[in-house]
Amino acid sequence: MLKANRLSIYAIGKIKKKWIREGINQYKKRMPDLIINESKSFNIDNIRVNNIIICLTEEGKSFSSTELTSLLLNFKNKKINFLIGDADGIPSDIKDKSHLLLSLSPLTFPHELARLILVEQIYRVISISNGSPYHRA
């Protein structure tokens, strides 16, 4: 079973669009233990060495929601950190240190919308791992 307290999102910049912030807040109410850090830059040294780092990037690998669930469950009890860049993406030196490059879709999304989609997918993955009816494949 996957729990929100093992998952963190590190994102560059603050969300400016109210409707996106409201959407994220709706999912945060369902997952109060999910950590979302917004800052001006990534400090990868602050992420513990034994944590899993997943960078969201357009050149990453895509998974179905059930495949992503299986992948994250394979990380056992490790903390999982998702990194989302700004409009310029994630610097290559940080991508090189990640465990996985993840693409949410072959489509390109604005970084703020990608954050909302990621939060929804995290909720979906947790629901799948818990046997909740939220995900109806």
UniProtKB/Swiss-Prot annotation:
Q: Which reaction does it catalyse?
A: pseudouridine(1915) in 23S rRNA + S-adenosyl-L-methionine = N(3)-methylpseudouridine(1915) in 23S rRNA + S-adenosyl-L-homocysteine + H(+)
Q: List the disulfide bonds.
A: none
Q: Which UniProt keywords apply?
A: Cytoplasm, Methyltransferase, rRNA processing, S-adenosyl-L-methionine, Transferase
Pfam families, per this entry? SPOUT_MTase
* Compartmental location: Cytoplasm
Coiled coil regions, renumbered to chain: none
Main subcellular location of this protein, as a coarse class? cytoplasm
Give the InterPro entries listed for this entry.
Alpha/beta_knot_MTases, RasGAP_dom, RlmH-like, tRNA_m1G_MTases_N
Instruction: Give the Enzyme Commission number.
Output: 2.1.1.177
Lineage: superkingdom: Bacteria
**A GO molecular function for this record?**
rRNA (pseudouridine-N3-)-methyltransferase activity
The record's top EC class is: transferase
Q: Where does S-adenosyl-L-methionine bind?
A: 56, 85, 104-109
According to the UniProt record, one GO cellular component term is: cytoplasm
* Stated family: Belongs to the RNA methyltransferase RlmH family.
Subunit note? Homodimer.
> Its function?
Specifically methylates the pseudouridine at position 1915 (m3Psi1915) in 23S rRNA.
Q: Which PANTHER family match?
A: METHYLTRANSFERASE, RIBOSOMAL RNA LARGE SUBUNIT METHYLTRANSFERASE H
- Please report the name of this protein according to its UniProt entry: Ribosomal RNA large subunit methyltransferase H
Classification from the root reads: Bacteria, Bacillati, Cyanobacteriota, Cyanophyceae, Synechococcales
The UniProt gene name for this protein comes to rlmH
